[in-house]
């Protein structure tokens, strides 16, 4: 993107975009390798030239105005399209090179995406991937933190996003053998109301859970005994492994190793937890670089072929 900065008008817009994304003048200056005063002068020059206030700022706080939010979304698309044009002109042979930002939930970053990206960059040494861990799932096309490619669970809230539906997330109810020995086995979902549940929220995994067994269904009510609910799946898993409680929605791919090592057991295996939809999401653009297209297909293939416990592979 920095090629665009040769033109002063475009340079000012690029500085504005960076400030909007990081929310801090000093951090924007560091990332652009310029002084804080240069950032401040650039923003003032830009606002004076268009006669619109884009940012409200003081010594401790900075936020976009309504006009600033509109300008950010539009200029992000314009600069991205212009950069894509430059890439196409400079790369007629469609060599896979350049950089891309990919965001996913922390648990995916820690156990899967980091290894996938290492493999990808080994195959394509002229690439650089920025992997960001994000727990929130309510991305919209105008979200400042919306990266070039986003791994997302749940539902798509914004109709103007482009997405590809990939293999759904299989979920299991599980507990450690230690917990089962102490509190006994569970024979029906209704028994869960008498057990300790370690809950999850903000993962597309919150809210009432309905289990299915052939033509029968059972909805687990809010009466279950939840002492702790977290948006960090690994913190929940660690408590379950220690025998502190049961988790009702553990990703099957994450549970696989612990099930094979007899560190976890499936609770109510004859009851099915509904799959969670998974998507790769991005903003629409006129041109997609060879890197974007290849990386998108690579991540899709890696996710769709992730390790799963055998009896869950029954799609």
Swiss-Prot record:
What GO terms are given for molecular function? DNA-binding transcription factor activity; sequence-specific DNA binding
| TM segment ranges | none
Recorded source organism is Salmonella typhimurium (strain LT2 / SGSC1412 / ATCC 700720)
Taxonomic lineage: Bacteria, Pseudomonadati, Pseudomonadota, Gammaproteobacteria, Enterobacterales
Q: Which residues bind DNA?
A: 25-44
Signal peptide span: none
Task: Please give the Pfam families that the UniProt record associates with this protein.
Answer: HTH_1, LysR_substrate
The cross-references to InterPro entries, in alphabetical order and at most eight, read:
LysR_subst-bd, Tscrpt_reg_HTH_LysR, WH-like_DNA-bd_sf, WH_DNA-bd_sf
Family, per entry: Belongs to the LysR transcriptional regulatory family.
Keywords tagged on the record: DNA-binding, Transcription, Transcription regulation
HTH lysR-type domain location is 8-65
Q: Name one GO biological process term.
A: DNA-templated transcription
Q: Does the keyword DNA-binding apply?
A: yes
The role this protein plays is: Probable regulatory protein. Its target is not known.
Protein name per its UniProtKB record:
Probable HTH-type transcriptional regulator SinR
Q: What PANTHER family does the entry give? A: HTH-TYPE TRANSCRIPTIONAL REGULATOR, HTH-TYPE TRANSCRIPTIONAL REGULATOR SINR-RELATED
């Amino acid at each position: 993107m920095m090629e665009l900065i040769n033109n002063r008008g475009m340079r000012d817009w690029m500085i504005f975009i960076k400030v909007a994304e990081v929310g801090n003048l000093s951090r924007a200056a560091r990332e652009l390798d310029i002084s804080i005063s240069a950032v401040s002068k650039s923003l003032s020059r830009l606002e004076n030239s268009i006669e619109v206030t884009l940012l409200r700022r003081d010594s401790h706080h900075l936020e976009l105005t309504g006009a600033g939010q509109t300008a950010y979304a539009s200029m992000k698309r314009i600069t991205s399209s212009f950069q894509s044009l430059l890439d196409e002109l400079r790369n007629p042979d469609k060599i896979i090179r350049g950089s891309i930002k990919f965001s996913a939930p922390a648990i995916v970053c820690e156990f899967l995406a980091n290894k996938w990206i290492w493999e990808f960059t080994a195959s394509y040494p002229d690439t650089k991937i920025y992997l960001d861990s994000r727990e929130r799932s309510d991305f919209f096309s105008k979200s400042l933190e919306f990266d070039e490619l986003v791994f997302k669970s749940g539902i798509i809230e914004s109709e103007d996003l482009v997405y590809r539906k990939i293999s759904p997330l299989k979920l299991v109810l599980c507990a450690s053998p230690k917990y089962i020995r102490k509190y006994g086995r569970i024979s029906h979902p209704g028994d869960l109301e008498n057990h300790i549940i370690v809950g999850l929220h903000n993962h597309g995994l919150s809210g009432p859970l309905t289990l299915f067994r052939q033509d029968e269904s059972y909805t687990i009510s809010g009466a279950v005994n939840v002492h702790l609910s977290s948006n960090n799946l690994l913190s929940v898993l660690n408590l379950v492994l220690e025998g502190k409680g049961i988790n009702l929605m553990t990703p099957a791919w994450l549970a696989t190793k612990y099930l094979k090592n007899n560190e976890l057991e499936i609770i109510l295996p004859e009851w099915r937890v509904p799959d969670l939809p998974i998507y790769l999401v991005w903003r629409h653009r006129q041109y997609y670089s060879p890197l974007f297209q290849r990386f998108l297909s690579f991540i899709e293939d890696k996710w769709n072929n992730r390790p799963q416990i055998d009896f869950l592979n029954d799609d």
